[in-house]
C-alpha cells in the first residue's frame, strides 16, 4: 500500500481528526446560536407580557407581567442568559488558548452544546407558554428558535453520543493515580 500524494500517515485516526479541525470550531460556534434564540424569546415574552392587560377586581387594567407566574419564568430566563453569556465567553477564551489539545477543544464544544441545548429547549418552551397562543405564531420567533435549537442539537450528533465519545479521550489524556 502506498499514497499517491504523500507518505501514508502512521496514525490514520489522528490524521483524519487533524484534517477536520473546523468541526471543533463549529462545535463551539453552533451552540452560541441557542443563546441568541433564548434572548429573542425573552424579548418577545417580555414585550407581550407588558402589552397584554387584564382587568382586576377594581376594573382597572393590569399588565400580566405583574403576576409572578408571568414574570418569574422571564426573569429566570434572563438569569440563565447572564450565566450562559459568561460561560460561553469563558469557553471561547479557553478553546482559543494555544496549549489546549484537540480532545479538550472537542470536549469544550460538547459540554457547551449539552448545557445550552437542554436549558434553551426548556426555556423556550416555557416562554412560549407565557405568550399563550401567540407563542406559537411564526412572527414571534419563539417556536422558530425552538426548532433551530433542535436542529443544532442534531447537527453534530446527540449530546449523549458526544459525551460517550468524549470519555475515552479524557481517560487516555489524563492518568489518575
Tell me the role of every PLM-derived stretch.
Residues 1-177:
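Flavin-dependent oxidoreductase catalytic core characteristic
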Amino acid at each position: 500500500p502506498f499514497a499517491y500524494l504523500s507518505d501514508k500517515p502512521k496514525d490514520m485516526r489522528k490524521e483524519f481528526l487533524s484534517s477536520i479541525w473546523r468541526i471543533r470550531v463549529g462545535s463551539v460556534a453552533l451552540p452560541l446560536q441557542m443563546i441568541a434564540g433564548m434572548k429573542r424569546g425573552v424579548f418577545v415574552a417580555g414585550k407581550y407580557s407588558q402589552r397584554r392587560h387584564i382587568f382586576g377586581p377594581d376594573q382597572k387594567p393590569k399588565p400580566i407581567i405583574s403576576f409572578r407566574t408571568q414574570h418569574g419564568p422571564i426573569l429566570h430566563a434572563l438569569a440563565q442568559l447572564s450565566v450562559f453569556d459568561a460561560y460561553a465567553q469563558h469557553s471561547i477564551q479557553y478553546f482559543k488558548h494555544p496549549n489546549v489539545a484537540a480532545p479538550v477543544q472537542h470536549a469544550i464544544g460538547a459540554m457547551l452544546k449539552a448545557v445550552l441545548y437542554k436549558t434553551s429547549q426548556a426555556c423556550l418552551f416555557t416562554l412560549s407558554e407565557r405568550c399563550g397562543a401567540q407563542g406559537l405564531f411564526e412572527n414571534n420567533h419563539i417556536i422558530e428558535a425552538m426548532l433551530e435549537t433542535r436542529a443544532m442539537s442534531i447537527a453534530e450528533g446527540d449530546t449523549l453520543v458526544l459525551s460517550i465519545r468524549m470519555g475515552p479521550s479524557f481517560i487516555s489524556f489524563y492518568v489518575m493515580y
